[in-house]
């Protein structure tokens, strides 16, 4: 059984899902995937069902009745990963390749000594894809504010590419 499950919230990601799942399932460490689809009209949910049938126990498709938002998609995915699948590590990422799956083995290795690993956009070697200047500006402002007000050391407190240890 997979110890690490990747939660991938989706809405209209039919153009990306097959390639993303191929890359995730080809990684070492027997990665599992939980696709949380918000009733995508482009067939993303049906694609997730197909993958679930091909890889039972490694791919799960969760279907929600409407576009309910990213936060609740993560909650649904975490509930599945923790309470039903028994994942030891849970990773969150976007389906649009703004987070590169090739970094996941490094994140897993780091998680052996850290409880949370953040795939930061704002460290040497990091970067952004598919983001407008306004979104990057707002993200940097939010991160600066979080560090200043809360004393956080993390460079990218708003990153969606994260790995959490269950414990």
Annotate each predicted stretch with a short phrase.
Residues 1-23:
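N-proximal low-complexity "stem/linker" segments adjacent to membrane-targeting elements
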Residues 64-81, 101-167:
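Acceptor/aglycone-binding surface of glycosyltransferases and processive sugar-polymer synthases
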Residues 37-46, 66, 97:
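A conserved acidic beta->alpha catalytic loop
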Residues 8, 30-40, 62-63:
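Short beta-strand/loop segment that forms part of the nucleotide-sugar
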Residues 15-19, 42-51:
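Acidic helix N-cap motif at the loop->helix transition within catalytic regions
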Residues 22-31:
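Short, acidic, metal-binding catalytic loop of nucleotide-sugar glycosyltransferases
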Residues 86-98:
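Short beta-strand-to-loop acidic/aromatic patch adjacent to the donor-nucleotide binding site
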Residues 6, 33, 61, 90, ...:
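Hydrophobic/aromatic residues located in beta-strands of well-ordered beta-sheets
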């Amino acid at each position: 059984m997979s110890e690490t499950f990747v939660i991938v919230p989706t809405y209209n990601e039919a153009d990306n899902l097959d390639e993303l799942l191929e890359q995730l399932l080809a990684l070492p460490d027997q990665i599992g995937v939980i696709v949380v689809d918000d009733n995508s009209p482009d067939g993303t949910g049906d694609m997730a069902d197909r993958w679930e049938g091909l890889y039972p126990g490694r791919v799960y498709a969760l279907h929600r009745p409407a576009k309910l938002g990213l936060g609740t998609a993560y909650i649904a995915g975490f509930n599945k990963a923790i309470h039903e699948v028994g994942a030891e590590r849970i990773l969150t990422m976007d389906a649009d390749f703004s987070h590169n799956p090739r970094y996941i083995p490094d994140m897993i290795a780091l998680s052996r000594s850290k409880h949370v690993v953040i795939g930061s956009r704002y460290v040497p070697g990091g970067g952004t894809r598919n983001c407008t200047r306004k979104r990057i500006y707002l993200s940097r402002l939010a991160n600066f504010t979080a560090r200043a007000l809360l004393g956080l050391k993390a460079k990218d407190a708003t990153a969606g590419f994260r790995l959490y240890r269950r414990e």
